[in-house]
């Protein structure tokens, strides 16, 4: 007979479970000594707040307490005034939950926990208090005290006893992101593999692997941005580097469209000239050498100045018999994007050094305000649908409760509110709700054992610890494993929630079964209403993300076509709005990748590669906004207006093919710039770079621009701008 194999738990998992259980028992002890009516609320709170990283525990503690305070205050204000009108009270509490849920979905960071908790806390306190509104204030105060004790104990134990800092996690993700960006740049700068001049990177690279690497980089940037929300709460010196980390996120995000643009410009040069020309190959080799020396810390200012001179020389290429106007335009665009990469990489290196200094206790330098998380993709329509589903589910349970006079109908409304909120960020929350329900059903026998058998036999605190330890310690071990977190949390939530809702001294089997039926009914109602109102497929969600991108591109071009761009110098340095668009597009790429994979790797009308193209497009439109004074006014307005019209029609589903007139307008504007005498200025080169990018992104299969279209034309001279 084979030996029974027991799971092996790591030291970190054992430490996490032990700290969580110790915090739970401390909270239970303090709540009992204080005479609070439901001390198991404190126990449940310690596990809800628990996290392997101390910084995440502290931030969740702050957010949870604020949400609890807001929710309990709303309950005290609403329930007494409406206790004599149960139908109206149910509607008002449902609307409150829906409003808070909608607000929470507008913030895709852990801060959203405040609003979500404010919503369902009102349901957890308000609905059970309907039958005794005179005791509502005392009940609300008791819940805040019990939850506050749980938060305090969890924060204390996880912060003081073997605290797990966020440094390895955050810095590991940060360095992996930098390494991926550096690898991408290194791939682009590889020298030609043979005399034909064809770069080695295109000869031996797997396109699918490269595409996966690009999408992983986008996902890592967004994940880092969300995870860094916890950094100011960390227990180590890492918290002093929060500003540098946020600034570095913005810098890496801004590098991505430039990396993608360089890759496309090299491909275009190879297609136009048959191979990478010697002058371009020499520049790539010089840039690659500088990058290697910069990474090794051996680069000096002379090497950087020499590289800048080479970039300037390529950008100043004059037309001759061997270089066509299109080849010249591609060289100007390539030089401009490589210059961005060089300066951006140097900024990233400085910020990484500042972070290392901050970890040693040095005061980090003051940073320009980062973009933060406000620029992440938001789907307001889905947020409103999620709120509507929560309102309808609560009203359905409330109507059944009122019509039947069911004594435990409050449990159904509570569970409907909680489960509609928990899974609102998913495209289709129903499978997750059903999975949670399955494990909640498995928790019922354990809850019955505690409520009906074990707890009535407990006569002192030592016995309580001994009774709780086996189940809660084991579930805590599995909570520390990401693969088992959801089942363990569902079981723990089911057991501790049942204990919190019952008076364990007077509970009987009838009240227990009644309460369990109410909870199950509420979860089923949440799943039913969500499936009817809110569930969508991955393909539907991916198309919404793509249409949001097209609408934003139309707005960017339309704003430029309507009014002159008047960005302040500080705004130009921060890269607003172009850098904000880059962050949002990287977030969308990270959102699209799993949805395309979930749909079997293919969604009609949605290609993952198109997202990178749209990312470059936004950078080019933003650059053209800044330097539009370099173009004749009529030409700039007509071009940007056509681009805005095209993307608005595309977002509305009214056009699929790119109009040939748009290609003609781009070629006309590009010809005027190449034929002008002012192409030596930074703004003029930026205009050429943006126009080349628009042509390549909108018409990648179009033949090179004809030489005959390039004629000298007068172009207004503008003040020097920021080179893009």
Model-derived regions, located:
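Helix-boundary capping/turn motifs
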Residues: 70, 95, 390-391, 613, ...
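A transmembrane helix-and-boundary motif of multi-pass membrane transporters/channels
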Residues: 1-233, 240, 350-607, 709-724
């Amino acid at each position: 007979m084979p030996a029974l194999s027991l799971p092996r738990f790591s030291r970190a998992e054992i430490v996490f479970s032990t700290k969580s259980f110790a915090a739970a028992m401390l909270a239970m002890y303090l709540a009992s000594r204080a005479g609070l009516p439901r001390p198991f609320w404190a126990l449940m709170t310690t596990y809800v707040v628990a996290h392997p990283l101390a910084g995440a525990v502290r931030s969740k503690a702050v957010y949870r307490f604020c949400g609890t305070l807001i929710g309990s205050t709303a309950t005290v204000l609403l329930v007494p005034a409406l206790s004599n009108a149960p139908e109206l009270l149910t509607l008002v509490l449902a609307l409150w939950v829906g409003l808070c849920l909608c607000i929470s979905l507008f913030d895709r960071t852990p801060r959203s926990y405040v609003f979500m908790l404010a919503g369902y806390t009102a349901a957890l306190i308000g609905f059970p208090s309907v039958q005794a509104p005179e005791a509502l204030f005392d009940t609300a105060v008791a819940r805040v005290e019990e939850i506050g004790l749980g938060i305090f104990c969890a924060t204390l134990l996880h912060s003081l006893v073997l605290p797990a800092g966020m440094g390895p996690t955050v810095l590991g993700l940060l360095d992996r992101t930098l390494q991926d960006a550096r690898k991408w740049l290194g791939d682009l700068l590889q020298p030609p593999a043979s005399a034909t001049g064809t770069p080695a990177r295109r000869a031996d690279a797997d396109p699918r692997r490269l595409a996966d690497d690009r999408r992983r980089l986008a996902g890592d940037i967004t994940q880092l941005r969300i995870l860094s929300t916890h950094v100011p709460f960390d227990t180590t010196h890492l918290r002093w580097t929060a500003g540098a980390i946020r600034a570095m996120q913005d810098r890496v995000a801004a590098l991505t469209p430039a990396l993608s643009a360089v890759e496309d410009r090299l491909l275009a040069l190879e297609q136009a000239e048959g191979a990478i020309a010697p002058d371009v190959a020499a520049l790539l080799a010089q840039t690659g050498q500088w990058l290697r020396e910069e990474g090794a810390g051996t680069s000096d200012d002379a090497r950087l100045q020499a590289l800048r001179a080479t970039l300037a020389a390529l950008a100043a290429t004059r037309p001759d018999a061997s270089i066509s106007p299109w080849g010249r335009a591609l060289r100007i665009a390539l030089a401009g994007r490589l210059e961005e990469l060089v300066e951006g990489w140097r900024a990233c290196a400085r910020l990484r050094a500042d972070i290392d200094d901050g970890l040693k206790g040095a005061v980090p330098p003051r940073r320009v305000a980062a973009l933060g998380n406000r620029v992440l993709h938001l789907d307001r329509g889905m947020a409103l649908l999620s709120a509507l589903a929560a309102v309808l589910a609560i009203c359905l349970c409330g109507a059944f409760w009122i019509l039947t006079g069911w004594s435990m109908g409050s449990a159904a409304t509570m569970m409907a509110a909680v489960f509609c909120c928990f899974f609102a960020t998913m495209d289709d929350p129903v499978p997750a709700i059903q999975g949670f329900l399955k494990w909640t059903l498995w928790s019922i026998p354990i809850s019955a054992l505690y409520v009906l058998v074990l707890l009535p036999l407990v006569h002192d605190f030592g016995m309580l610890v001994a009774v709780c330890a086996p189940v809660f310690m084991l579930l805590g071990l599995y909570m520390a494993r990401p693969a088992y977190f959801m089942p363990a949390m569902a079981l723990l939530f089911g057991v501790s929630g049942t204990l919190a809702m019952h008076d364990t001294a007077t509970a009987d089997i009838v009240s227990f079964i009644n309460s369990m039926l109410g909870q199950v009914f509420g979860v089923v109602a949440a799943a039913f209403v969500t499936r009817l109102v809110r569930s969508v497929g991955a393909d539907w969600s991916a198309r919404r993300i793509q249409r949001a991108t097209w609408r934003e591109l139309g707005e960017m071009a339309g704003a430029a076509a309507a009014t002159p761009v008047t960005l302040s110098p500080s705004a130009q340095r921060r890269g607003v709005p172009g850098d904000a668009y880059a962050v949002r597009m990287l977030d969308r790429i990270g959102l699209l990748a799993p949805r395309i994979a979930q749909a079997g790797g293919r969604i009609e009308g949605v290609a993952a590669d198109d997202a990178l193209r749209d990312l470059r497009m936004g950078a080019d439109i933003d650059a053209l906004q800044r330097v539009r004074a370099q173009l004749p006014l009529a030409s700039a307005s007509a071009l940007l207006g056509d681009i805005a019209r095209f993307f608005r029609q595309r977002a509305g589903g009214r056009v699929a093919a790119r109009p040939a007139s748009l290609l003609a307008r781009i070629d006309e504007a590009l010809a005027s710039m190449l034929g002008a005498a002012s192409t030596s200025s930074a703004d003029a080169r930026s205009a050429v770079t943006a126009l080349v990018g628009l042509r390549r992104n909108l018409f990648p299969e179009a033949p090179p621009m004809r030489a005959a279209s390039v004629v000298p034309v007068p172009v207004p001279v503008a003040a020097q701008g920021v080179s893009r």
